[in-house]
């Protein structure tokens, strides 16, 4: 199954978001130093989809993620996504929805699939914000490496070294994205 045909306002939002992200990507590529790359990301590399319940924000986010990861345009990024849901009970639901709706996105398992070999643009790790940012035993496990998996921090560093951008979709941000300080640290 592929994504349903978007409604006019959804299509317009997706096109506008892609324009913003592609502009940020062009600025990032032209930047000559880390400070310029950080500025390009901070000023142009994020957006907020705010719309009423039932308007298809999750569908639009998936369409943006899928299209921006596609290798069919030079202005797209080679990107790995982290898709945050507000509650653990929604993780499996989000994974199933992404798998069934977006053929250009590949869901990966954050617990056991933290390796860079075989990574491709459009890979998506679905989890909760608390699972990577909170200070608890489960988070420490994800943030620690093992014999067969990298720590989350090392995974992100290696992906960046391999030329991947790191993208984040925060679904229902008002529910679980509590502390900006932890978000910046991540």
Q: Where are the predicted features?
A:
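RecA-like P-loop NTPase motor core of helicase/translocase proteins
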Residues: 1-186
